[in-house]
Regions:
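Conserved phosphate/ATP/ADP-binding segment of small-molecule kinases
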Residues: 1-64
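Glycine-rich beta-alpha junction loops
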Residues: 8, 47-50, 70-73, 105-109
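Short, small-residue alpha-helix embedded
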Residues: 11, 74-97, 101
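Short, charged, surface-exposed loops that flank catalytic or proteolytic processing sites
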Residues: 17-26, 92-102
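Gly/Ser/Thr-rich helix-start
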Residues: 47, 79-81, 126
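Short pre-catalytic strand/loop immediately N-terminal to key active-site residues, enriched for Gly-Thr
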Residues: 64-78
Length: 135
């Protein structure tokens, strides 16, 4: 499994971030190139458009999906770590990949909304402890 944001995916593949095609065909091409390096399950995280954030879920030889959620506040340190940890834990528990990703997105949506209310400095990450029992 690999869960890069777009910047990380571009660096891995030596692509110019500013020239990347973000259409579904472009995202499939990025994920297939990453998959050729080993991982069969990939999520390109944090694709922003307006008030939404998208995660592109790719699983080799399966139908891909673009999952959206609301953008809450500014960027936060550590969200990718929390995301990949929840997905990994859900996979270990036997959930399928798309369900695991949706579980992580739902958890982060709640935790980020709570963090926005608490207003800690951005580099403190997210206040996820409030929702740990839900995962």
């Amino acid at each position: 499994m690999l869960t890069p944001n777009l910047t990380e995916a571009c660096r891995i593949l030596d692509l110019d971030y500013h020239k990347v095609d973000l259409s579904e065909e472009g995202l499939v091409a990025i994920c297939e190139a990453l998959s050729d390096m080993g991982p069969s399950r990939i999520v390109i995280t944090g694709l922003q458009q307006g008030d939404l954030i998208f995660n592109y879920i790719f699983e080799k030889n399966k139908t891909s999906e673009l999952l959206s959620t609301r953008k809450i506040g500014g960027d936060r340190s550590g969200t990718g770590d929390v995301f990949s940890s929840i997905v990994t834990g859900a996979l270990i528990q036997g959930q399928d990949f798309k369900t695991a990703v949706k579980r992580a997105v739902t958890f982060l949506d709640k935790a980020i909304a709570y963090t926005a209310q608490m207003e800690p400095p951005w580099n403190y990450g997210i206040c996820f402890e409030e929702y740990l029992e839900e995962i």
